[in-house]
């Protein structure tokens, strides 16, 4: 328990500041996206100030090994890095989805992120330590990169990895009525 905080659960007055919510933290340099934490608990100090117990998400470039080609632009890692943040400092809301949920979004906004890995910051370890790979390049899935399924083998490929382009694949699929 944080030494300055009494264990008096507070009322959670708004959607933006409730248990389980994530919010953009704009402390990193402006060139980097926000580094959102997830609220786990809100407590009231003896002074009446409210504090949030949060766990931080890490961007790939902050983790051991750095950003890889398969990490998407909006990818974050859950972590075991906990901290306390003043509730009054929270000024926004964002959503951190599991990868499958993110793939199902009809529209991805600036406040949508996704996660598929947990990162133990103190040890520099990831879970899971292996993920499925796709395409001739044998890379894990990156939702930012266009892929097409081969009807013959039902495998997924990046057009450029099989000597094609997104435009050529789109025109081919359009001519056969397979693309909206």
Predicted features along the sequence, with ranges:
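Cys/His-coordinated zinc-finger cores
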Residues: 150-170
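Short beta-strand-centered aromatic/proline hotspots
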Residues: 21, 31-45, 52-55
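Residues immediately within or flanking Cys/His clusters that coordinate Zn2+
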Residues: 36, 51, 131-134, 147, ...
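A short beta-strand-loop micro-motif that forms or neighbors metal/cofactor-
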Residues: 167-180
């Amino acid at each position: 328990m944080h030494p300055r905080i009494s264990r008096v659960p507070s009322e959670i007055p708004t959607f933006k500041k409730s248990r389980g919510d994530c919010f953009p933290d704009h402390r990193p340099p402006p060139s980097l996206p926000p580094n959102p934490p997830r609220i786990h608990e809100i407590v009231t100090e003896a002074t009446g100030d409210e504090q949030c117990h949060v766990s931080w998400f890490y961007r790939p470039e902050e983790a051991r090994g750095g950003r890889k080609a398969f990490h998407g632009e909006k990818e974050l890692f859950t972590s075991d890095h906990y901290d306390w943040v003043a509730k009054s400092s929270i000024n926004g809301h964002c959503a951190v989805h599991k990868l499958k949920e993110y793939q199902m979004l009809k529209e991805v906004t600036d406040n949508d992120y996704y996660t598929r890995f947990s990162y133990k910051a103190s040890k520099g370890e990831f879970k899971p330590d292996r993920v499925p790979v796709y395409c001739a390049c044998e890379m894990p899935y990156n939702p930012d990169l266009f892929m097409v399924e081969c009807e013959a083998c039902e495998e997924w490929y990046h057009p450029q990895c099989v000597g094609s382009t997104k435009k050529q694949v789109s025109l081919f699929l359009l001519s056969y009525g397979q693309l909206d």
